[in-house]
Amino acid sequence: MSKFELIPYRLYLSQSRTWMHKIKAEVKIYVLLLLWISFFILSYRKLLIVAFSLIITSSTIKCNQYIVKKHFAQTLVMGIAAIMFSFSITNSYQYNLKKEQYRSISSSLAQKTIQRYTPKQITHFNNQISEKLLFAIKPGSYFFITIYSIKLVMITTSSENLALSIYKTKIVNQIFNNELLFIFLLSSHIFNNIVVKMEKITQIISLRGSLNLLKHSTGIFTLFFLISKLFFSEIIKESTEISQSLYTRNLNQENDNFLKIYTSQIRTNDYICLFICTTYVTILFLS
């Protein structure tokens, strides 16, 4: 009975048998946590190396390449939009900073107190475009690594296996106490509220046309909002499918027979994946 596998909610996930599909869900969750921890210990350039590594990894998944390419294109567009938005905010910040410094110098000259005046400067950015681009790439790389790694895991693992892998851990059971299904049901409403709040922010910014920031970033903000709205609608759809999948199979802690169906032993490939991922991040950190 323990070897029996139910047909998951998405048939294309269960029908594929690539190397990434065969890795246990617990190992994939560990790799995700390892990637997210790397945000705090790796530099910009090393994060770009991690992003390219994810792209190379996705290219090795020979099955379902159409789905992989579709999600890669969506995530890449969102990452580029995040970089452009950050770069626009950086330019607007630098422009307003110089304008404020010029205004302070002019007022000081008018009051004849220029002898001891030292203009206030904030040295976050210089005039070099490369430094501003490097600063703008950071949020884009964060976004790409986070979202694309999650999508790769979701493509190669059924929603039920991921949910049950989290559900069977002792820490989650102690914290949530059989509320996992409620969390998945609630997540779709949370993302829906995010879309509504983004629409309100856009309306407020459009009404306040006198803002200096609006003159430099309205177009890119509108584009970023439209892409984000499309992206969050995809997440709402994913979350709804997960909640429906869990609900139709009557997930609860007392149903031991149901949990036994998904129990499986860790294999050699799982140990190899754990070793390679841990060594890879360690080498990037020490180099």
Swiss-Prot record:
Topology within the bilayer: Multi-pass membrane protein
**Primary place of residence?**
plastid
Print the keywords alphabetically: Chloroplast, Membrane, Plastid, Transmembrane, Transmembrane helix
Subcellular location(s) per record: Plastid, Chloroplast membrane
| Gene Ontology CC, one term | chloroplast membrane
- Give me the segments passing through the membrane: 32-52, 72-92, 133-153, 175-195, 216-236, 266-286
**What superkingdom does the record give?**
Eukaryota
Q: Which residues form the signal peptide?
A: none
Family, per entry: Belongs to the ycf92 family.
Name recorded for this polypeptide:
Uncharacterized protein ycf92
Instruction: Please report the organism this UniProt entry assigns to the protein.
Output: Porphyra purpurea (Red seaweed)
